[in-house]
């Protein structure tokens, strides 16, 4: 070969001496070695005869040959034997090696590399390009109209209503009445004194209005379910869950991963991602999961729940039989982004092992996933729908060998929207499996957990349910009645003046999120959107753009509220309060993760009172930082006026976007028709893909999930043609819900003590008969005769 011939020309033809030009010759030899290094595999296979001949040479000749080959094999060299001595350069690592995740220069957050190889090439409509063209066109046509616009803005500010009283009244904290009974009674007494002192005076000052807050009637009501503990449910839980093990010093000793007897490849993987010490949920879960027990785990957001179930899975898979490749683990997640992130976490933790992973989520190439599943990877991370698709339609893919099932964000997976898909998966997987469930708002309802097929699970609740982290500051901006329509003005004011970097804004609806995306673009705010109407490529691009700092705002629906771990998120803004406290906990959990600090702001109007009250009450119980932020009404009105002026531009952008989507759809249909003609025989030869539900059943499941999330309001809104409900309709619905809850009978204190049930029954019978007159029960209708005189 060429390198060897060059070496012969240097070493054999001419032997240099000290007096010769040694520098030039040495440089030439280095250049030869750097040009083409010999492969390592060649130096490993050395014939025995050659070894015997080489043993007769001097040791300095052996060293020279090793240097010529370009490397030294092993600790003791290529041809040396292991004499049992320890390498002098070896160092013991007693700690994890990395004190903090931020101090590790190699780790830059979880990426989407596992999904990119199965992604297509289409990018969809470039909304930024459309907005850029519209802005350039507008700026070019309105150069001479600067002065009239300035005058119009001054007139608009002069005509604006001064709502300072409303904003000062925000100090009553809109939901702060959710404290203890003593605080409520004290506030009520103060309110009565203030009202008596100011009776007959219409023009109270701002200070007086702050000093005498009037609590809302709904804030004083406490449901009977919160006051009385349901012992029947407690008995069910005691029978269903495994008995609590006595606390020992072993858990206290788990101050490091080394004390858990984990293998060295796993410890190296933990060090590479910056995990120095196990979190409480990890220190509790890993030893129990290694025993093969079922686990129901819950902890606050950002506490490392993914690593809590991935680490014991990897440790167990290190000792698997390796002769026949077998899929042994299935991890299910409710959203594609969460599954992709879980795949990234597991891949990095297993970077020093031979464990194989497969990502099977919707929106990515089926063929790529089928080819990976054909190799039978050890761990399959998937969403329920795509997993069922492969389970029914992919050849050479079987789930008979699955030994471990993990449900990430299990409370969401147990809701009505996933009920049918989850039942299909659970009935197909083997019964003798280990099952682990994790969530920040983990349910304790035994009736829901029974469906999963758990076998005496161990309940590991590190934190109380529906709890936020201590480092999170929660702020609420109250929108007084009549100002809900100016919500977008408040949002733009916050993003322009207060929170300008690394902000996630949550919306309830995809339509509003997309509308806000266009407004932000026209106002010059760099942003990206994330919701279900986008293609998977666009969704990944949006998350990566926000993660890399290319955009400052991520406008998302609740698609991004669960599990998404983006490094450095400083602020979360709720455009409106979510439907429940559980969703609120997951939303605000996108910031203040892994011990960092963060801020969550909620724009709350009157319909959001119920959720805000629950959030404030939960925050007060744990001592969280809760405050009310006051925004000047004039500032919000000025931004809302600018937004109203952009309505024509917004409609024009949406119209142009729709036209480009139609053109892209037509182009795709044309290519599809060409492929149908060109590959007709191959397409017809493919087996038809099947599903376990009909279209009618799928639609019913979607409606059930939507109804469980939004309640009766969604159905009533459809009845009114999709229009927003009036306050009157909303009050009717709330009254119906309260009446429905009141009809549900629960045991009281007397019934649990064995008393009161018969008495209550007698009272009900006597009340039905009528009032008692003269010691007798009067019958219904007109009384017969006069009562007896005494």
UniProtKB/Swiss-Prot annotation:
Limits of the Helicase ATP-binding domain: 286-460
Record-annotated Helicase C-terminal domain positions: 490-634
Binding locations of ATP: 299-306
Region described as Disordered: 19-234, 748-790
Chain ranges passing through the membrane: none
BP GO terms, sorted: gene expression; ribosome biogenesis
One CC-aspect GO term: cytosol
Compartments reported by the entry: Nucleus, Nucleolus
Pfam families: DEAD, Helicase_C
GO MF annotation: an example: RNA binding
Main location: nucleus
Keywords carried by this UniProt record: ATP-binding, Coiled coil, Helicase, Hydrolase, Nucleotide-binding, Nucleus, Ribosome biogenesis, RNA-binding
Motif DEAD box: chain residues: 408-411
Basic residues bias locations: 40-56, 777-790
Organism domain of life: Eukaryota
Acidic residues: bias regions: 21-34, 61-70, 79-90, 154-167, 196-209, 219-233
Reactions this protein catalyses: ATP + H2O = ADP + phosphate + H(+)
Ranges spanned by the short sequence motif Q motif, renumbered to the chain: 255-283
Compositionally skewed regions (Basic and acidic residues) per UniProt: 137-153
Record has DNA-binding as a keyword: no
EC number: 3.6.4.13
Residue stretches in coiled coil: 631-677
Family classification: Belongs to the DEAD box helicase family. DDX27/DRS1 subfamily.
Function, in words: ATP-binding RNA helicase involved in ribosome assembly.
Name recorded for this polypeptide: ATP-dependent RNA helicase DRS1
The species this protein was found in: Pyricularia oryzae (strain 70-15 / ATCC MYA-4617 / FGSC 8958) (Rice blast fungus)
């Amino acid at each position: 070969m060429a390198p060897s011939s060059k070496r012969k020309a240097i070493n054999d033809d001419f032997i240099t001496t000290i007096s010769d030009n040694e520098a030039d010759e040495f440089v030439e030899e280095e250049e030869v070695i750097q040009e083409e290094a010999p492969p390592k595999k060649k130096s490993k296979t050395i014939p025995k005869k050659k070894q015997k001949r080489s043993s007769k040479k001097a040791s300095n000749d052996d060293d020279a040959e090793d240097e010529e080959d370009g490397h030294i094999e092993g600790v003791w060299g290529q041809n040396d034997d292991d004499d049992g001595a320890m390498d002098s350069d070896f160092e013991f690592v007693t700690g994890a090696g990395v004190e903090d995740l931020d101090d590790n220069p190699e780790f830059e957050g979880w990426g989407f590399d596992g999904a990119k190889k199965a992604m297509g090439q289409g990018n969809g409509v470039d909304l930024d390009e459309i907005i850029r063209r519209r802005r350039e066109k507008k700026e070019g046509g309105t150069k001479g109209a600067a002065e009239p616009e300035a005058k119009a803005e001054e007139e608009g500010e002069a005509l604006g209503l001064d709502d300072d009283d409303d904003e000062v009244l925000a100090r009553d904290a809109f939901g702060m009445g959710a404290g203890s009974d003593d605080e409520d009674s004290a506030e009520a007494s103060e309110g009565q004194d203030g009202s008596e002192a100011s009776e007959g005076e219409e023009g109270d000052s701002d200070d007086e209005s702050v000093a005498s807050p009037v609590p809302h009637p709904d804030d004083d009501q406490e449901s009977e379910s919160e006051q009385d503990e349901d012992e029947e449910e407690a008995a069910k839980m005691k029978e269903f869950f495994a008995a609590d093990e006595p606390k020992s010093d072993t858990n206290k000793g788990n101050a490091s991963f080394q004390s858990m007897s984990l293998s060295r490849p796993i410890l190296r993987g933990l060090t590479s991602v910056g995990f120095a010490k196990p979190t409480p949920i990890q220190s509790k879960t890993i030893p129990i999961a290694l025993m093969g027990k079922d686990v129901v785990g819950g902890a606050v957001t950002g506490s490392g729940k993914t690593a809590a179930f991935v680490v014991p899975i990897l440790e167990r898979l290190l000792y698997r039989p390796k002769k026949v490749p077998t899929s042994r683990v299935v991890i299910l997640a409710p959203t594609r982004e969460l599954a992709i992130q879980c795949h990234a976490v597991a891949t990095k933790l297993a970077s020093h092992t031979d464990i194989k992973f497969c990502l099977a989520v919707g929106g990515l190439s089926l063929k790529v996933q089928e080819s990976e599943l054909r190799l039978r990877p050890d761990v399959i991370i998937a969403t329920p729908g795509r997993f069922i698709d492969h389970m029914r339609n992919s050849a050479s893919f079987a789930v008979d060998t699955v030994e471990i099932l993990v449900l990430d964000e299990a409370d969401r997976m147990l809701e009505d929207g996933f009920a049918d898909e989850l039942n299909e998966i659970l009935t197909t997987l083997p019964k003798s499996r280990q099952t682990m469930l994790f969530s920040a708002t983990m349910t304790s309802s035994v009736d829901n957990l029974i469906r999963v097929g758990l076998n005496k699970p161990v309940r590991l609740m590190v934190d109380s349910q529906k709890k936020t982290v201590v480092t999170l500051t929660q702020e609420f901006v109250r929108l007084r009645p009549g100002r809900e329509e100016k919500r977008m003005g408040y949002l733009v004011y916050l993003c322009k003046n207060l929170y300008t970097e690394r902000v996630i804004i949550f919306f309830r609806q995809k339509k509003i999120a997309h509308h806000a995306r266009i407004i932000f673009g026209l106002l010059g705010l760099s942003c990206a959107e994330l919701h279900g109407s986008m293609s998977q490529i666009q969704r990944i691009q949006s998350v990566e753009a926000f993660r890399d700092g290319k955009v400052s705002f991520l406008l998302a629906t609740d698609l991004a509220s669960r599990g998404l771990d983006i490094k450095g998120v400083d602020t979360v803004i709720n455009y409106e309060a979510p439907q429940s406290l559980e969703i609120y906990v997951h939303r605000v959990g996108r910031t203040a993760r892994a011990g960092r600090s963060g801020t969550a702001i909620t724009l709350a109007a009157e319909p959001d009172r119920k959720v805000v009250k629950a959030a404030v009450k939960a925050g007060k119980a744990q001592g969280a930082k809760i405050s009310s932020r006051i925004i000047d009404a004039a500032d919000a009105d000025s931004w809302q006026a600018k937004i109203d002026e952009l309505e024509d531009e917004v409609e024009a952008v949406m119209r142009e976007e729709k036209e480009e989507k139609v053109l892209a759809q037509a182009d795709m249909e044309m290519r599809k028709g060409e492929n149908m003609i060109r590959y007709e025989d191959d397409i017809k030869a493919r087996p038809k893909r099947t599903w376990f539900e009909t279209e009618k059943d799928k639609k019913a499941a979607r409606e059930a999930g939507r109804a469980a999330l939004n309640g009766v309001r969604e159905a009533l809104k459809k009845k009114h043609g999709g229009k927003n409900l009036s306050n009157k309709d909303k009050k009717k619905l709330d009254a119906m819900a309260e009446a429905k809850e009141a009809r549900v009978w629960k045991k009281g204190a007397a019934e649990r003590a064995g008393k009161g049930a018969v008495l209550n029954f007698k009272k009900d019978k006597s009340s039905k008969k009528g009032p008692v007159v003269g010691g007798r029960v009067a019958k219904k209708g007109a009384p017969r005769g006069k009562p007896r005189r005494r």
